[in-house]
Every structure is written in C-alpha cells, then in structure tokens.
Amino acid sequence: MKKIEAIIRPFKLDEVKIALVNAGIVGMTVSEVRGFGRQKGQTERYRGSEYTVEFLQKLKLEIVVEDAQVDTVIDKIVAAARTGEIGDGKIFVSPVDQTIRIRTGEKNADAI
C-alpha cells in the first residue's frame, strides 16, 4: 500500500475529487495548509497598506491505495490539478506498512 499526498490549489479540489471518484477512489482526507515554494508570495492591500503574504493557501489531499492504483491516482491528480503555472503543487508517495479501520478492526486492503 502507498500513501499519496498531494498539495494542490484550493479551487482545483472539485475537479480532482471528481477525477478520483471516477477512477474508483472511495475516500480521501483533505486539510487546509499554507506554504511557499517557487510561487513565492503575493502582494495584497489591507486598509490602504500593501503587504506581502508569503505563505499561500493550499489543500493537502491524503489518499491510501493499493500499489496497483498509484500510477492511476497520480495521473488523475496531475490532469485535474494542473494549470501550467508555478504553484500547481506537488505529489509525494510513501509506503504504508499497515492500515486499520478503527470501527471494525479490518486491516490493510479491507480497511481502505
């Protein structure tokens, strides 16, 4: 099993979710996060003063899948989240040793 973590632009969430559901993914966790990278900050105005927001709002998606689904999930996220501009995000893939559904005690693939 693998855990796929994707950092995406917030307005792309619906497109990514639809693409993943259509690919058979039945669950994911979404968290609001802030960060910076090549996109840098952006200048905003507040009460007549300009200031730079260095940490930009993003969403972090966490999805645990069987190894055979990893490439499909990555392809779906990239296709749905891409704008072609700096700041589209990143995808990280990590191994998952064990998964347990707390309610039933099911483990691994049965718990996904």
Curated annotation (Swiss-Prot):
Pfam families documented for this protein: P-II
Residues bearing the modification O-UMP-tyrosine: Y51
Gene3D superfamilies: 3.30.70.120
Claim: Protease is one of the keywords in the record: no
GO CC terms, sorted: cytosol
UniProtKB keywords: Nucleotide-binding, Phosphoprotein, Transcription, Transcription regulation
Residue positions where Phosphoserine is found in the record: S49
Keyword Ion transport in annotation: no
SUPFAM superfamilies tied to this protein: GlnB-like (SSF54913)
Gene Ontology biological process terms, A to Z: regulation of nitrogen utilization
Molecular function GO labels: ATP binding; enzyme regulator activity; identical protein binding
Record's comment on post-translational modification: Phosphorylation dependent on the nitrogen source and spectral light quality.
Subunit structure: Homotrimer.
Assigned protein family: Belongs to the P(II) protein family.
Function: P-II indirectly controls the transcription of the GS gene (glnA). P-II prevents NR-II-catalyzed conversion of NR-I to NR-I-phosphate, the transcriptional activator of glnA. When P-II is phosphorylated, these events are reversed. In nitrogen-limiting conditions, when the ratio of Gln to 2-ketoglutarate decreases, P-II is phosphorylated which allows the deadenylation of glutamine synthetase (GS), thus activating the enzyme.
PANTHER family associated with the record: NITROGEN REGULATORY PROTEIN P-II, NITROGEN REGULATORY PROTEIN P-II HOMOLOG
This protein's name: Nitrogen regulatory protein P-II
Species the sequence originates in: Synechococcus elongatus (strain ATCC 33912 / PCC 7942 / FACHB-805) (Anacystis nidulans R2)
Designated gene of the protein: glnB
